[in-house]
């Protein structure tokens, strides 16, 4: 008798949530990922379709960018840019939320900015650039926001090696 294959977290099929289904029904390619511990739907998209999908989600009612950030999956692995969106309205007792993730190759971490859709992304994208080196191509003011301008490297990458010494210059 053949052995049954037990699905692992890597092979388990994730049921598409309402946002993923809506995107698919409207011709936007996406992949449903497992919901987070709070039950927030997570959708993976390619960087080439991030802007059209972001604009569609804004038109669909996701009018608030709660958070934009990044993280590193580990040395030699992808970097991730994520966008936590919320539908804010006067009559919502429980606002709908979705998290959009874009997985970027470490050697080419480029993605378009969503600043043009949600103005609050401005400094959040700059922080993600500053800490992880994710390039938001077309951002109007993409420069370091936390680290000194002459800092070398991306401090929150898991393969970052801290310098032994860095001398801060007086501002005056």
From Swiss-Prot:
Disulfide bonds: none annotated. The keyword Translocase applies. One of its GO terms (molecular function) is quinone binding. Coiled coil: none annotated. InterPro entries: NADH_DH_suC (IPR010218), NADH_quin_OxRdtase_su_C/D-like (IPR037232), NADH_UbQ_OxRdtase_30kDa_su (IPR001268), NADH_UbQ_OxRdtase_CS (IPR020396). It is a peripheral membrane protein. Keywords: Membrane, NAD, NADP, Plastoquinone, Quinone, Thylakoid, Translocase, Transport. One of its GO terms (cellular component) is plasma membrane-derived thylakoid membrane. The keyword DNA repair does not apply. Its main location: membrane. It is found in: Cellular thylakoid membrane. It catalyses: a plastoquinone + NADH + (n+1) H(+)(in) = a plastoquinol + NAD(+) + n H(+)(out); a plastoquinone + NADPH + (n+1) H(+)(in) = a plastoquinol + NADP(+) + n H(+)(out). It is an enzyme of class 7 (translocase). Its EC number is 7.1.1.-. GO terms for biological process: photosynthesis, light reaction. It holds the Pfam family Complex1_30kDa. NDH-1 shuttles electrons from an unknown electron donor, via FMN and iron-sulfur (Fe-S) centers, to quinones in the respiratory and/or the photosynthetic chain. The immediate electron acceptor for the enzyme in this species is believed to be plastoquinone. Couples the redox reaction to proton translocation, and thus conserves the redox energy in a proton gradient. Cyanobacterial NDH-1 also plays a role in inorganic carbon-concentration. Belongs to the complex I 30 kDa subunit family. HAMAP family: NDH1_NuoC (MF_01357). NDH-1 can be composed of about 15 different subunits; different subcomplexes with different compositions have been identified which probably have different functions. This is NAD(P)H-quinone oxidoreductase subunit J.
